[in-house]
């Protein structure tokens, strides 16, 4: 074995210092590796240059080392993973975005990047941006057939994405803490996730439901690891789980498939192990048994390599890095091991073929996986009695064609544009269904085309008997007012019943995995607005004339006239006093079942089974610790559910709100609003409801009082209507991203523009609390993207609002662009004090907002920063004005009077003095205000 560090391989800052590398992965063909680091970049390196390091330098001068550098992420890159088919590279970051990269074969590298000396010999472009996580992304993993990619993160969620279309299939929120690792079963049946809640959860790929929760090996495991990256053995038998405990000793737990028990612990590290990686190859030892090789690395900066045939490690290297090991990966041939560390170095270990034993062929690996159903398309051998029950249930459902139809067709409209031929096309069954089922019993709207159909689509043509009569096309002829005859053009081609081949599908590597999974329908309630917000329609906004079937000159003239009048038309569209019907939110989709837990705990759960009429009413069941506490029936379907420690609230599709106590008593008669509820949120004793027409309601349910008269969102949503053009149309109108109510009863709304508004019940108007302007211009803006604890989020709402703005800027990709524009602007003449002025204004706005919202902690903290800033910049008049205003107020906050706040500010002044001039001026202020 040889171990070497590559001096030129790393992520460096402007001064040449190494930056932490958090992830490393190798391409399936072994030609390149990818690294992701603290600088927010992904770098592609040539493995040929790495392998030739320390050889004749003259021969390697022209050999490219770094192939490409991608810097689209706005935060630290925590995970990089090539797809097994080699087409894509997936990267995750603490900017909460997953980016799918695709190598452009037809386009060469772009050479040097402007402003840097880095050369690019390959061109990797951002192919998809996957949004859905609410916090840092910690790990990614592809299924072995490249049909799925799963991301996990610090928001405790697991998101499953389609590996071809990259649409989100399902979001799973079963873990109770940060999810820090993910691995896929090579047989394609399961994937496993590891979390700081000290569990590993095994999930079925067929329906994304949980197979087993494993807790035993992780009791008292430390929560200090940055990652918990497990690995699945290539024969499918075992999972290597890092950060496990064997009594007081840290270890790696080996979990056996099927029983999901852990009888083997690998002990050899002094600190917690963060990452494990099985060699993708199997080896045969002297006793003719198949052997797996496992590499482990962690916080003790040591590397250990284990063989399943030996009780002790094959290799144990201590202090190979100066900091913890972040990621480990094996080359496809199983003879090279790559490690990266937080100290910014990459270690390469190369082995000889005989060191691990005789390497077995890929066919033998497939045979080892065959007993778990790998490679079987028609039928999969069941691994448990529960799977047999699921198959029998699926068979019973598919025997009833009507059972796959929508419960209420009036609530969920079906697409009318699907060709009849497409509806009748037989579809191949999913791999997890029994082989005895026929394709004719499956509703093609519920299942996607099989992999074979996608890989080789057929164009529509004549039938097999050759007697099909072609359809006669009839062109539409219209006569205008001027007597001119207009003939509408007719499309001669027809739509194919089979989806057309995409550029990506045509180049896919062939795998023996299951067919493409259909999008999943979730059973959880829509208790928050979607990440991208809900569509908003201002009544009367006609931004484009639809003249698909009318090509008359009059229609074209009307379009030109409308384009000229459009700007003035929007400026007077909405008045600030407008209430109903100016805004139209999309109502939540109908759900057959809704389950909502109180405060995300399973102790109190409300389950809703929706009906369709009075003959089939909606059933509501409240559970406490799994036992039925109370039950009720409603004649209308339920669309939203929320709850607090004081009450449950249920919204029906007829615009009614039903309020129950936790014991099931009705607190009030049903509250009627003017339209369906689009959003429902509660906090403590307060309930917030936003209707589909944009009306905002808020009540104190305990006191049974309204906080204010129903108010419209129109004033804050119509601000940019003057900027709407025919080209931009309604998609540029701002929409609501997040809405909530604080524990003090203050409603807040965050728009897609990054602005957050709160409604003041004393001023009776919407007030803007945060906006992107402060984020890009103020030095005191919190752009860390982290909230330290739940207690902090409860006591610092303004901090939450600023994080919302950060999230919107990062999701839209505008953050870096705006910061660069500001950085360029302040270098020009006349902008010397730009950042100082904007920072002072930001702090003043934050102080006023804290007083408005009665936030004592944030008011005091921001006031202290404000006082220090004014003193250091010599703005003594502003400082004296601020102290004088505080002194005159009898009640400056909930807990403190104005004089008490002034006393605290004087202490801050005394501590912040640095120069003699500041000392003299500060003493005068202290003497003036300390005596009053």
Curated annotation (Swiss-Prot):
The gene is hip1. This is Protein hir1. Gene3D superfamilies: YVTN repeat-like/Quinoprotein amine dehydrogenase (2.130.10.10). Interacts with his3 and slm9. Its main location: cytoplasm. WD repeats lie at residues 16-55, 72-111, 132-171, 174-213, 222-265, 268-316, 320-361. Belongs to the WD repeat HIR1 family. Keywords: Chromatin regulator, Cytoplasm, Nucleus, Repeat, Repressor, Transcription, Transcription regulation, WD repeat. It holds the Pfam family Beta-prop_CAF1B_HIR1. Residues 405-426, 441-453 have a biased composition (Polar residues). InterPro entries: CAF1B_HIR1_beta-prop, HIR1-like, HIRA-like_C, HIRA_B_motif, WD40/YVTN_repeat-like_dom_sf, WD40_repeat_dom_sf, WD40_rpt. Probably required for replication-independent chromatin assembly. Required for transcriptional silencing in the outer repeat (otr) centromeric repeats and the Tf2 long terminal repeat retrotransposons. Repressor of histone gene transcription in G1 arrested cells. Required for repression of htb1 gene expression outside of S phase.
């Amino acid at each position: 074995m040889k171990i070497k560090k590559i001096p030129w391989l790393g992520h460096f800052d402007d001064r040449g210092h190494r930056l932490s590398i958090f992830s490393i992965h190798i391409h399936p063909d072994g030609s390149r590796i990818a690294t992701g680091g603290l600088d927010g970049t992904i770098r592609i390196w040539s493995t040929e240059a790495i392998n030739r390091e320390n050889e004749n330098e003259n021969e390697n001068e022209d050999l490219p080392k770094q192939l490409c550098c991608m810097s689209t992420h706005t935060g630290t890159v925590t995970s990089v993973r090539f797809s097994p088919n080699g087409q894509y590279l997936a990267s995750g970051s603490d900017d909460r975005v997953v980016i799918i990269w695709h190598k452009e074969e037809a386009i060469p590298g772009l050479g040097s990047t402007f402003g840097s000396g880095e050369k690019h010999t390959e061109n990797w472009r951002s192919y998809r941006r996957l949004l859905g996580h609410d916090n840092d992304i910690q790990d990614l993993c592809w299924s072995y057939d490249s049909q799925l990619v799963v991301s996990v993160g610090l928001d405790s969620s697991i998101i499953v994405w389609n590996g071809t279309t990259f649409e989100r299939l399902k979001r799973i929120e079963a873990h109770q803490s940060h999810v820090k690792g993910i691995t896929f079963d090579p047989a394609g049946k399961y994937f496993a996730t590891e979390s700081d809640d000290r569990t590993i959860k095994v999930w079925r790929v067929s329906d994304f439901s949980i197979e087993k929760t494993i807790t035993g090996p992780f009791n008292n495991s430390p929560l200090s690891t940055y990652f918990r990256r497990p690995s699945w053995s290539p024969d499918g038998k075992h999972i290597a789980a890092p950060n496990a405990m064997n009594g007081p000793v840290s270890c790696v737990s080996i979990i056996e498939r099927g029983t999901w028990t852990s009888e083997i612990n690998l002990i050899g590290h002094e600190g917690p192990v963060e990452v494990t990686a099985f060699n993708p190859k199997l080896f045969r030892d002297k006793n003719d048994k198949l052997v797996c090789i496992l590499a482990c690395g962690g916080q003790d900066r040591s590397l250990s390599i284990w063989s399943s045939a030996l009780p002790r490690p094959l290799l144990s290297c201590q202090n190979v890095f100066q900091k913890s090991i972040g990621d480990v990966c094996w080359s496809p041939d199983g003879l090279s091991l790559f490690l990266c560390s937080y100290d910014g170095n990459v270690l390469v270990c190369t082995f000889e073929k005989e060191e691990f034993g005789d390497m077995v062929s890929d066919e033998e690996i497939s045979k080892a996986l065959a007993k778990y159903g790998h490679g079987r398309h028609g039928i999969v051998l069941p691994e448990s009695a529960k799977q047999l029950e699921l198959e029998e249930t699926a068979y019973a459902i598919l025997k009833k064609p009507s059972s796959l139809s929508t419960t209420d067709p009036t609530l969920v409209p079906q697409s009318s544009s699907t060709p009849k031929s497409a509806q009748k096309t037989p579809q191949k069954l999913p791999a997890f269904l029994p082989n005895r089922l026929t394709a004719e019993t499956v509703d093609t709207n519920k299942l996607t085309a099989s992999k074979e159909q996608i890989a080789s689509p057929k164009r529509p043509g004549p039938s097999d008997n050759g007697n099909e009569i072609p359809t006669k096309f009839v062109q539409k002829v219209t006569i205008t007012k001027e007597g001119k005859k207009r003939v509408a053009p007719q499309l001669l081609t027809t739509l194919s019943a089979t989806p057309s081949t995409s550029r990506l599908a045509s180049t896919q590597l062939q795998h023996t995995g299951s067919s493409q999974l259909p999008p999943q329908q979730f059973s959880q309630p829509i208790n928050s607005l979607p990440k991208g917000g809900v569509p908003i329609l201002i009544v009367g906004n006609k931004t484009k004339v639809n003249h698909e079937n009318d090509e008359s000159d009059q229609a074209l003239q009307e379009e030109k006239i409308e384009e000229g009048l459009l700007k003035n038309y929007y400026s007077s569209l909405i008045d600030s006093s407008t209430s109903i019907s100016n805004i139209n939110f999309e109502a939540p989709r109908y759900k057959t079942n809704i389950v909502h837990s109180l405060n995300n705990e399973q102790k109190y759960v409300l389950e809703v089974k929706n009906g369709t009429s009075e003959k089939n009413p909606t059933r509501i069941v409240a559970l406490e610790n799994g036992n039925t506490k109370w039950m009720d029936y409603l004649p209308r379907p339920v669309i939203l559910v929320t709850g607090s420690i004081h009450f449950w609230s249920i919204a029906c599709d007829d615009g009614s709100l039903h309020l129950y106590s936790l014991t099931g008593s009705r607190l009030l008669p049903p509250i009627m609003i003017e339209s369906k509820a689009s959003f429902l949120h509660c906090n403590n004793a307060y309930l917030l409801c936003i209707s589909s027409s944009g009306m905002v309601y808020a009540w104190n349910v305990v006191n049974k009082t309204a906080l204010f008269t129903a108010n419209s969102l129109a004033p804050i949503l119509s601000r940019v209507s003057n900027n709407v053009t025919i080209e931009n149309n309604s998609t540029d109108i701002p929409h609501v991203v997040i809405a909530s109510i604080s524990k003090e009863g203050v409603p807040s709304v965050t728009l897609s523009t990054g602005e957050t508004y709160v409604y003041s019940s004393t001023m009776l108007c919407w007030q803007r609390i945060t906006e992107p302007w402060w984020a890009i211009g103020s030095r005191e803006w919190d752009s860390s993207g982290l909230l330290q604890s739940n207690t902090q989020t409860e006591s610092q709402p303004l901090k939450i609002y600023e994080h919302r703005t950060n999230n919107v800027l990062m999701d839209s990709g505008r953050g870096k662009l705006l910061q660069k524009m500001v950085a360029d602007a302040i270098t020009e003449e006349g902008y010397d004090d730009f950042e100082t002025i904007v920072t002072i204004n930001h702090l003043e706005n934050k102080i006023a907002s804290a007083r408005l919202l009665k936030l004592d902690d944030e008011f005091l903290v921001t006031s202290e920063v404000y006082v220090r800033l004014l003193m250091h910049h010599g703005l003594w008049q502003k400082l004296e004005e601020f102290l004088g205003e505080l002194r005159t107020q009898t009640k400056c906050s909930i807990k403190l009077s104005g004089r008490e706040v002034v006393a605290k500010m004087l202490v801050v002044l005394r501590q912040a003095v640095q120069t003699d001039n500041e000392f003299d001026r500060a003493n005068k202020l202290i003497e003036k205000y300390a005596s009053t």
